[in-house]
Amino acid sequence: VPGNKDTTLNTIRGLEGLPAHLTHIQFHSYGNEGDFKFSSGAAEIAELVNANKNISIDVGQVMFGQTVTASGDNMRQFANNHHADPKKWVCMDIECDAGCGVVPFRYKDQNFVNALQWAIGLETFLLVDDPWRVFLTTDHPNGAPFTTYPHLIRLLMDKSFRQDMLQTINP
């Protein structure tokens, strides 16, 4: 949701030194600036994480390619079924008490939102000073399968490779 970075920032501030781990923070690091009202809030979040030693995070890095979204929020999965790629998905309800949904999804490097999500994750990894407080994750399978970890590690460790990849995505 564009603008959700404010909730993340307020959550960190509101903890007032209590220890906390924030999961899949890339999905909660969106600003609402720019022509499309969708931007990165990673720098602000990384700055606050760096200033609050009580906070650890995992990134939930988006990687380009095929994955699936899996969630117990079957109503959200139902609402997102039009994004299914390929156009097959499943959603089930168990006596109105519980449910789940699985929607196949393809993150595309030429899609503005997907490219920005990818960049926000990398930005977060690279701006948090203490590597022991930022965990390498893709929110498997939602951001990408864990099998993309070698590619992600290369993106983080090889600046020229990262720059080459940046040249190929949606500007």
PLM regions: where:
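Histidine/acidic residue-rich metal-binding segments in metalloenzymes
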Residues: V1-R133
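Divalent metal-coordination and catalytic microenvironments
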Residues: T138-D139
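Short glycine/threonine-rich loop-to-helix capping motif typified by GTGT followed
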Residues: A144-P150
